[in-house]
Amino acid sequence: AMSGFVIGNKTIYKNLHSLKAGEIVIFQGNSYEYLQYYKYFGEIINKSFEDYLKELSEVTLNIFRKMLNKIGDRQIIIPLSAGNDSRLVASILKHLGAKNVKCYSYGTPENFEVKIAKIISQKLDYEWKLIPLTHKSEKIFYASKDYKKYLDYSETYCSVPYIQSLSTVKYLKNINWINDDAIFINGNTGDFISGGHINLNILDASKLENIEFRKENILSQLIEKHFSLWGYLKTDLNKNNLKVNLWNEIVEGCSDIQKNSNDHLLYEYSEFIDRQSKYVISGQRIYEYYGYNWRLPLWNDEYLLFWQKVPLNYKLKQKLYIEMLKKNNFGNVWGDDIPVNKKKIT
């Protein structure tokens, strides 16, 4: 209840367990064993900022180029906001020559996200549609049978269903604005993978040698950001129980815990294995529910392998990511004349 997702391989049922991200089960006769074939935790490689900037540009272009080659002429639908990630998707597709692309946004016409998304779409020469949402329209939708059917469809027993944009995809389908074989591509989850969730306190604490102090700092940051949905549940008892479970999961999955340069990796590993893979990614089920395919280029294997080796000082405040976007200026939509939404890291 404090987060909307479970920790580890637990579910809401006592004797039912799930696989964690990057994990398989191998059965042999009457026995079985869990094997983690991938973890978002790597060896930090120290290179110059310029070298990393060049590599990130190449990796990003390569990922989208290969994806576009496989998609071919199929229609691409982009949920576009004023943030970096969906703008990257739209602008790099334009840079690579993709033509069969539509963008949409939702909310009120005077919303900052909507205004900027419209400007971006116009500059890229991509068709754009606003889906106006009101309290009344959303109240009607969330009381509908369709919404209840989606809850059953998307149940995983380890996370609450992701429902943001559910009504908007249905709206677009109902007005026949989307081809039946269209592919949705959103920006999940560029902000996390590029360092946008790392608090400056992680940097300050990582300069210390005391593992207990650093451990407490990492766990406190995780709880503050991801386990604070209900303030009245943040009792000392609940927080202490959370810390034990979170730290056990980190110790089980990560090596070199004593190394203070790995503090941000421990923090990101925990978010990756729980919140990102259980809750955030489940939002893709929305597209599946209405019969559409999707792609997640910013979760591509190449991106994971790249970002897990980047030093902390290049990831703080998304320094490397943002510099790459501005330097390449895909689609000419990365100037100061088209502002990015402001997000506060807590």
Which sequence ranges carry the predicted segments?
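Cysteine-centered catalytic environments shared across enzyme families
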Residues: 1-80, 84-136
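A conserved beta-strand->alpha-helix junction
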Residues: 114, 118-154, 243, 249, ...
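Short secondary-structure boundary/capping segments
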Residues: 96, 120, 145-149, 195-214, ...
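Short, solvent-exposed loop/turn segments at secondary-structure junctions
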Residues: 84-85, 109-111, 135-138, 188-193, ...
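Generic recognition of stable, solvent-exposed alpha-helical segments in well-folded globular domains
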Residues: 20, 51, 55-59, 84, ...
